[in-house]
């Protein structure tokens, strides 16, 4: 008779296993270098093949959605940094955009362009971390070092804008806190000229490497049907033959004015996902280059003129008494959107990042729900890992590019 699950009984003790001397139960993680966070997998093996896989999550659960109900909308922005802490601008933006749509705030054009620039730099940073750790899992130490070297340039640029390298809090409700510093664009364009050459170096080292292809081709195949039924998005969905990118299908910011391609593949294996991440970084460079023309042609406003919801600029706060009072009220009492609900989805580096807010007209959301791509991509392990060799588990997990801060929230 199985033991009834309760909050004190560990997850794996509630799983029924048939006694079979030909099978073995293996705990993968939660302290495993290839788990990319506190992920635990209970694997049932028949020889070297996985016949059953059960992901156990929750080690990094912080109750972020409940925290939002006890914080003002402005106070919650730094918390969004900790969802996907590898691409925090994507989280900042998705939350702020949802609040702006709820409050019907029109964000100035220059602020929208700066958001696109930071989002694409964040995408490159996230993809480089994927490439570095994925290569290291399979034994390619050189690519790990090269990718981290280039990632430093990206983090340095973001740091020069907002002062933080990882948890940026770079977006504000109603716009952006700062314009781009003098000389910043020139540095970014210099990076955009150099980075495609670096990508080619990665591809020369990996794409036709015999060992790399043997480890990734026809491994961890996700069919189109499985990807759709499991709620996959981003590269995980596009690698399985579904050409879907929210930036193209439901454009936001100024993405509808930018020319870029949506790479996709049909193989659905680890190698296809690797190829798409490489191609996406090239598209990010194309987007960043086009943003210069849009930025130069835009007016200097970076904060919306909505006194009920948006604080004045720092210069106005320090020089105008009315602006100081307005800022004091907004910060101490918080903004109060009208009653209603909103769901906004954006294309984060890992897939569809959605924010649902239910407002009852108070300074804190009545309910906030974060739809993270990594949660769906982790849930697919129960189907994806069955039939795979134990030696391929690290490669498959790496190719799904999950982050446990997103999974557990």
Curated annotation (Swiss-Prot):
Its EC number is 7.1.1.-. Keywords: Cell inner membrane, Cell membrane, Membrane, NAD, Quinone, Translocase, Transport, Ubiquinone. One of its GO terms (cellular component) is plasma membrane. It is found in: Cell inner membrane. Disulfide bonds: none annotated. Its main location: membrane. It catalyses: a quinone + NADH + 5 H(+)(in) = a quinol + NAD(+) + 4 H(+)(out). It is a peripheral membrane protein. GO terms for molecular function: NAD binding; NADH:ubiquinone reductase (non-electrogenic) activity; quinone binding. Pfam families: Complex1_49kDa. Belongs to the complex I 49 kDa subunit family. NDH-1 is composed of 14 different subunits. Subunits NuoB, C, D, E, F, and G constitute the peripheral sector of the complex. NDH-1 shuttles electrons from NADH, via FMN and iron-sulfur (Fe-S) centers, to quinones in the respiratory chain. The immediate electron acceptor for the enzyme in this species is believed to be ubiquinone. Couples the redox reaction to proton translocation (for every two electrons transferred, four hydrogen ions are translocated across the cytoplasmic membrane), and thus conserves the redox energy in a proton gradient. NCBIfam families: NuoD (TIGR01962), PRK06075.1 (NF004739). This is NADH-quinone oxidoreductase subunit D. The gene is nuoD.
């Amino acid at each position: 008779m199985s033991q009834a699950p309760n909050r004190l009984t560990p997850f794996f003790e509630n799983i029924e296993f048939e006694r079979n001397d030909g099978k073995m139960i293996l705990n993968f993680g939660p302290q495993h270098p290839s788990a990319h966070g506190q992920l635990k997998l209970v694997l049932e093996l028949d020889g070297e093949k996985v016949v059953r896989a059960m992901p156990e999550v929750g080690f990094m659960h912080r109750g972020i959605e409940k925290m939002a109900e006890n914080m003002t909308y402005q106070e919650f922005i730094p918390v969004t940094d900790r969802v996907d802490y590898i691409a925090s601008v994507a989280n900042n933006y998705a939350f702020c955009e949802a609040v702006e749509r709820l409050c019907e705030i029109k964000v100035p054009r220059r602020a929208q362009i700066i958001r696109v620039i930071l989002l694409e730099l964040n995408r490159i940073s996230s993809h480089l971390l994927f490439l570095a750790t994925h290569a290291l899992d399979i034994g390619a130490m050189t690519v790990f070092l090269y990718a981290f070297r280039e990632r430093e340039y990206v983090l340095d640029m973001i740091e020069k804008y907002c002062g933080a390298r990882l948890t940026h809090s770079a977006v504000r409700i109603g716009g952006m806190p700062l314009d781009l510093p003098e000389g910043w664009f020139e540095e970014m364009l210099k990076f955009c000229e150099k980075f495609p050459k670096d990508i080619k170096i990665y591809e020369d080292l990996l794409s036709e490497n015999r060992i790399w292809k043997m480890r990734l081709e026809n491994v961890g195949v996700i069919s189109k049907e499985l990807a759709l039924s499991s709620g996959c998005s981003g590269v995980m969905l596009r690698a399985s033959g579904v050409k879907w990118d929210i930036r193209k299908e439901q454009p936001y910011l100024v993405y509808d004015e930018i020319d870029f391609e949506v790479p996709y593949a049909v193989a659905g294996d680890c190698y296809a996902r690797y190829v798409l991440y490489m191609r996406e970084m090239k598209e990010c460079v194309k987007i960043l280059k086009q943003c210069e023309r849009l930025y130069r042609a835009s007016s200097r406003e970076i904060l919306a003129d909505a006194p009920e919801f948006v604080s004045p600029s720092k210069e106005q706060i320090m020089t105008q008494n009315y602006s100081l009072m307005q800022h004091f009220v907004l910060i101490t009492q918080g903004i109060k959107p009208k009653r209603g609900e909103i769901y906004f989805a954006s294309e984060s580096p890992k897939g569809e990042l959605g924010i649902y807010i239910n407002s009852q007209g108070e300074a804190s959301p009545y309910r906030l729900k974060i739809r993270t791509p990594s949660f769906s991509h982790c849930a697919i392990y129960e189907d994806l890992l069955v039939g795979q060799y134990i030696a391929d588990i690290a490669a498959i997990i790496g190719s799904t590019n999950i982050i446990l801060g997103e999974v557990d929230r």
